[in-house]
Regions:
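Basic, Lys/Arg- and aromatic-enriched nucleic-acid-binding interface segment
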Residues: 61, 67-71, 75-77, 90, ...
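Basic/aromatic-enriched alpha-helical hairpins
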Residues: 7-67, 84-86
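C-terminal secondary-structure termini that scaffold catalytic or DNA-interacting sites
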Residues: 57, 192, 198, 204-208, ...
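Short basic/aromatic active-site micro-motif
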Residues: 43, 134-136, 228-247, 269
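Short, polar N-cap/turn motifs at the start of nucleic acid-interacting alpha helices
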Residues: 159-166, 229, 248-267
Length: 291
């Protein structure tokens, strides 16, 4: 086949894709907006690198917030495109995959951003006034449980054990089921929205079986209280910081957050310094007072 547009390729690829990760569709749509009716044989590594560079710098509207992206986020975006082109090769539309020659320029991952106590209260108050009535619930759950955005958006009422204050996460980043505790402050608000059945808690008003796109009320809330350089994912970092500074060990924190690697949790090690100092002070003072 001499002439196949990128749009035709993506539509064909998506129609046969059987994965469960909804973000895959969003990333495919991102690439569709970048190349659209461009013939696939005319797309070169330099074209892909240009798009990814702008995406990494947060200069492209569309998928995700308009903020600098981490290396891993950029690599995931590239991976989707590579899979699309691999499909084209399998269908004999292409001989080579232009995405395989693209190199991601290494940049330091963004420093984790945590909400201060004042920022947290201002943000939660702004979310109470959002046009979407579950904005406050979503943010409160993110802060108090440390769940990922995808885990929250895939939560169903049938996943919530109100009696024990637990959520069963069937759709996690690591592909493993996880039981997550829900603190009383969040559980009480969940009860206010409680519905019978197994529907999504955070559903789209256009399709009850699809998660809501909450970016607009989220960004409005951030802008309203003038909180800058903050991503929704940073609510997870905020939850981790509260756990560690509250005395949870790094292992316990990793268990709650669902980290597969202890190395991931070690990024919060510096936050436990104060807790360790207080613990050492308390124990040693007790030891030497007994002498």
């Amino acid at each position: 086949i001499e002439f196949v547009t990128f749009k035709t390729l993506v539509n064909e690829y998506i129609s046969q894709w059987t994965g469960k990760d909804d973000s895959y569709y969003l990333r495919s749509a991102f690439w569709l907006s970048a190349f659209n009716d461009k013939p696939i044989k005319s797309i070169k590594p330099r074209h892909i690198e240009k798009v990814l560079a702008k995406y990494a710098d947060g200069k492209i509207n569309g998928y995700g917030s308009n903020m600098p992206k981490s290396n891993n986020t950029v690599l995931r975006m590239k991976s989707v495109l590579s899979s699309i082109f691999q499909y084209a090769i399998d269908k004999n539309y292409l001989d080579k995959n232009p995405a395989t020659k693209v190199r991601i320029k290494a940049v330091p991952n963004q420093i984790e951003r945590f909400l201060s106590e004042d920022e947290r209260e201002r943000l939660l108050n702004a979310c109470k006034e959002a046009s979407w009535d579950r904005m406050h619930l979503l943010v409160l759950l993110a802060i108090t449980t440390g769940m990922r955005k995808s885990e929250l958006l895939n939560l169903r009422w049938s996943d919530i054990n109100f009696e024990d204050g637990l959520a069963t996460l069937n759709t996690t980043k690591n592909g493993e089921k996880r039981i997550n505790p829900i603190p009383t402050v969040a559980l009480d608000e969940l009860k206010q929205h409680r519905e019978v059945g197994s529907g999504l808690i955070f559903f789209s008003r256009y399709n009850l079986d699809k998660p809501i796109d909450f970016r607009k009320p989220w960004f409005i809330a951030l802008e309203k209280v003038q909180i800058t350089d903050f991503r929704f994912h940073d609510l997870r970092h905020t939850a981790a910081s509260y756990l560690v500074m509250g005395g949870a060990t790094l292992h316990e924190t990793g268990e709650i957050l669902g980290h597969k690697s202890e190395q991931t949790t070690k990024r919060y090690a510096h936050l436990s310094t104060g807790h360790k100092s207080a613990l050492s002070e308390r124990v040693m003072n007790k030891v030497f007072k007994n002498k």
